[in-house]
Amino acid sequence: MTAATRLGVFSEVGKLRKVMVCRPGLAHLRLTPGNCEELLYDDVIWVQQAKRDHYDFISKMQDRGVEVVDMHDLLAQTMALPDARQWLLDRKITDENVGVGLADDVRAWMSELSAASLAELLLGGVVGGDLPEDFDSREMALFREFMGRSGFVIPPLPNSIFTRDTSCWIYGGVTLNPMFWPARRQETLLAASIYRFHLDFANADFEVWWGDPEKDHGAATLEGGDVMPVGNGVVLIGMGERTSRQAIALVAQSLFRHGAAERVIVAGLPKLRSAMHLDTVFTFCDRDLVTVFPEVVNRIDTFSIRPGDNGADGRLDIRPEKAPFVDVVGEALGLPRLRTVQTGGDSYEQEREQWDDGNNVVALEPGVVIAYDCNTYTNTLLRKAGVEVITITAGELGRGRGGGHCMTCPIIRDPV
């Protein structure tokens, strides 16, 4: 199988062949001013418009030959398989997640749903009003009395739209990421069921480098927006608000043990919501061109991790880098230097455009990216640098603080 057809991501800008997205849906209809902060959204969204804008995003990728698969559809197809359905429900509908006295009834009810309905509720959440009226246990009566018909039996997962974070393909394998905030951790279990059972993946040749949604990873948290397999045996990993040093070391250890990478470059980021992941301040647009938010990127503390002298024992050689982060990345790729396009405009406009994901672009191939339309200054600078910028509407999709890079989980991408 060639690099173009086997599962795996071998660069940040090589031809994008296959990508997973997750369209807005029931989970976003259940966002309210009262719960959106807990669910990591800054505001509620106009869901119908968000759906239209997301469809446009998908269409523009398909127009360039990208195979786009949606997590809703993959999950529904997975839940049509009896073994997969039982595996997932046994792990998701538990006393710990749903409640003693409720879990058995809820699991039995969900076991009988159609595959499409089950997938919708696994992503969109289950409220008291969804459950059959003949659920008459004492525990159900207490739930209805105190939580009402709109109380969450299973909370929604609106951040599933940001498929980049839940799992990340690094060269010929994938990580199943234990995410930082409790509001997102159940997303990984859904992704694991797809990779384990769906026919696109069940018989494919790939490794799970690290991560297990059935395991407590403690302080080791990882999110895909911090992870970039850039080629030449190099992986960039941001260490900031969401991804911890413990997880980075474990991922590096696994990649080195399997011979999948030779060097992990760690970008130490300030712990800011506006810079929650590396890809909110730094993304690739071409083989030698990146867009950066200088206020953060210029402050990155850079470290390189390589296998220790005796690679077999799992020890790591961790060393600080003296050069700026962008220069270290260019050197690791064998380039004289990386060209940079900074967030555009004056200091006010730069801060606004970074907040609106001006640096969070996704490359479809070298020199072609998708970006939000509202970031006019940054997009103009990218075009002046020779990049083809395809725009999508930001108004609703951007309210969860993620752009095109965040909303895509590349599954097959060529090297450069």
Swiss-Prot record:
Primary subcellular site in the record, as a coarse category: cytoplasm
Alphabetized UniProt keyword annotations: Arginine metabolism, Cytoplasm, Hydrolase
Gene3D superfamilies xrefs: Arginine deiminase, L-arginine/glycine Amidinotransferase, Chain A
Broad EC category: hydrolase
Active site: C406 (amidino-cysteine intermediate)
Pathway: Amino-acid degradation; L-arginine degradation via ADI pathway; carbamoyl phosphate from L-arginine: step 1/2
Pfam families: ADI
GO cellular component, one term: cytoplasm
Recorded GO MF terms: arginine deiminase activity
InterPro entries for this protein: Arg_deiminase
GO-annotated biological processes: arginine catabolic process to ornithine; arginine deiminase pathway
Catalytic activity: L-arginine + H2O = L-citrulline + NH4(+)
Subcellular location: Cytoplasm
EC number(s) reported in the record: 3.5.3.6
Homology family: Belongs to the arginine deiminase family.
Designated name of the protein: Arginine deiminase
Gene name of the encoded protein: arcA
